[in-house]
A protein has these predicted regions:
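Conserved "HGTGT" condensation-loop signature of ketosynthase/thiolase-family condensing enzymes
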Residues: 1-124, 128-136, 144-150, 158-343
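Internal active-site segments that recognize and position negatively charged phosphoryl groups
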Residues: 141
Length: 343
């Protein structure tokens, strides 16, 4: 596959900070007035739209719009606040005299479209909503576009958490023992390395379904072999270990919707971190072990924060470094991302 280089990165994330008034990690947001300068446009944006648009604009910087051949965004749950607002209004007004703005702003492609409109980028614009593999799908699309000849592609992922969504996921048992989070990350990818690329994306693979540790190990080994590597060549191994919740566990009050949800909840509570620990011990005992969800929390596109973190932390590397990121979302959606940092 055509080499793909990361030229710029931007992130809005919780930074590991906890808000006592929220049972999840909440993103530390910047002053949007300095990034989204149009006050009318900014006022109409919901919180996640402002997060995503500001992060994307920061990543683009002063790059001329004609040099960007595509904007590809990803989200697992979309604009939850606007969706909730529209549905509540629908109920309160008995389906009459509805304000269309929350509905328009709640569509999944809103963020990519707003970035294109603000910067005047008339190019390929796509949004992926593939649950826990949304970011990986967007990244793979960007790599294929670059392989077809595109110069610069802007790739981003974002998800927000709301009190309503958190309460629902807790009742379903999805967040038992898991600290939820949110955030937005953007990456400017290019075909050419240029003078100072931040890193190179060497490969990506996704797979879905319940997997045993042995099956995951075999997939990782085959993935590395296809990229001319073995487990001893990986200097950094980053996993999605999730920090256990520090507040009261309300598991006794959780509601399981149907019997088919029981295996999923058992996997989340007992196997989530165990899979990562077994891989660290069995495949990468000599690699440096890193994690990222203790800083950003669990959300469908959290793997985008993992990529941002390894690129940021590898800036001062003095030797070539191979970095493998393995993440699974609720033990169902699995992804492998191979990154190389050259000197």
């Amino acid at each position: 596959m055509q080499p793909v280089y990361i030229q710029r990165i931007a992130s809005i994330h919780p930074q590991g900070k906890r808000n006592d008034s929220r049972p999840y990690l909440q993103a530390c947001e910047p002053d949007y007035k300095n990034i989204i300068t149009n006050p009318t446009l900014r006022r109409r944006m919901s919180r996640i739209v402002k997060m995503g648009v500001a992060c994307g604009l920061e990543c683009i910087g002063g790059l001329p719009p004609e040099e960007i051949q595509g904007i590809i965004t990803a989200t697992g749950l979309g604009c939850l606040v606007d969706t909730e607002k529209f549905l509540n209004t629908l109920i309160d007004n008995e389906e009459r005299m509805l304000n269309p703005t929350p509905f328009i702003q709640s569509t999944f492609n809103t963020i990519g479209a707003q970035i294109a409109l603000i910067r005047g980028i008339h190019a390929y614009n796509m949004t992926y909503v593939h649950r826990g593999l949304s970011f990986e799908s967007a990244l793979l699309d960007a790599m294929m576009k670059i392989g077809e000849g595109s110069g610069h592609i802007l790739v981003g992922a974002m998800d927000e958490m709301t009190d309503t969504s958190h309460a629902i996921q807790q009742r379903l048992g999805i967040l038992k023992g898991i600290e939820a989070g949110e955030g937005a990350q953007f990456f400017l990818l290019s075909r050419e390395a240029g003078e100072h690329p931040l890193a190179e994306i060497k490969g990506i693979e996704t797979f879905a379904g319940q997997q045993t540790t042995e099956e995951i190990q075999n997939r990782i080994m085959r993935f590395l072999q296809r990229n001319g590597l073995n487990s001893r060549d990986i200097q950094w191994f980053m996993t999605g270990k999730n920090k256990q919740q520090s507040w009261q566990d309300n598991s006794s009050k959780q509601t399981i919707i149907s019997e088919k949800d029981v295996p999923l909840n058992q996997a989340i509570t007992s196997e989530s971190n165990a899979i990562y620990e077994k891989l660290e011990t069995n495949l990468f005992p000599e690699s440096m072990h890193l994690s990222f969800k203790d800083e950003c929390g669990e959300y469908p596109t959290a793997s985008s924060y993992a990529v941002w973190k390894v690129v940021k932390e590898s800036e001062n590397c003095t030797t070539p470094t191979n970095i493998l990121i393995y993440n699974h979302h609720h033990s169902i959606n699995h992804s492998l991302i191979l990154i190389r940092k050259s000197v």
